């Protein structure tokens, strides 16, 4: 005798096919989500590294600018008060001089002032330099352009000093 088992072939096979397709779709969907998350994580990582490098570069730039600004606004200089006063500036930007005085015999008056390692100077052969020209060390706050060439003939001065007020460079004797 033969016996047959009714497996509900139509209904059961349709259910198996649908279940198989759903599982396949779910696996594909999970794989796609994993790939998309990995790509987003990679983009975020690259962006973070790029911003870190840019920030480090900007911080270095700000540091360099601060160094340049501090160098431009304050210049350390050695000032010697002797029969003639010599001021040797380390930079030729805007000079704000700090005093470091060594006194020997105090002079009656200042007759010479040098800036920028002697390239630009006044030299008055008759009389004294006025306060604006260097007799008073508090008055020395000049924007100096070191030119090292005479500005012209004047019997009281061999050379003059040049100042820059931001718009023009002016050489003056008095």
From Swiss-Prot:
* Residue ranges of the TM segments: 33-53
Specify one Pfam family: Sh_2
Q: Which keywords appear in this protein's UniProt record, sorted alphabetically?
A: Glycoprotein, Membrane, Transmembrane, Transmembrane helix
> Where found in the cell?
Membrane
Q: How does it sit in the membrane?
A: Single-pass membrane protein
* Glycosylation-annotated residues: 165
Highest taxon of source: Viruses
A GO cellular component term found in this entry reads: membrane
Q: What is this protein called?
A: Small hydrophobic protein
According to its UniProt entry, this protein's organism is Turkey rhinotracheitis virus
């Amino acid at each position: 005798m033969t016996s047959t088992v009714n497996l509900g072939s139509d209904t059961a096979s349709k259910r198996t096919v649908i279940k198989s397709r759903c599982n396949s779709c779910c696996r594909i969907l999970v794989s796609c989500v994993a790939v998309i998350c990995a790509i987003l994580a990679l983009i975020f990582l690259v962006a973070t590294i790029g911003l870190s490098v840019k920030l480090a570069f900007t911080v270095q730039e700000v540091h360099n600018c601060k160094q340049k600004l501090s160098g431009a606004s304050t210049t350390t200089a050695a000032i010697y008060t002797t029969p003639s006063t010599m001021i040797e500036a380390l930079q030729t930007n805007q000079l704000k001089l700090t005093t470091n005085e060594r006194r020997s015999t105090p002079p009656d008056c200042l007759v010479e002032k040098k800036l920028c390692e002697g390239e630009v100077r006044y030299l008055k052969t008759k009389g004294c330099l006025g306060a604006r020209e260097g007799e008073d060390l508090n008055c020395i706050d000049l924007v100096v352009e070191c030119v090292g060439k005479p500005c012209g003939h004047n019997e009281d001065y061999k050379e003059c000093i040049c100042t820059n007020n931001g718009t023009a460079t002016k050489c003056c004797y008095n």
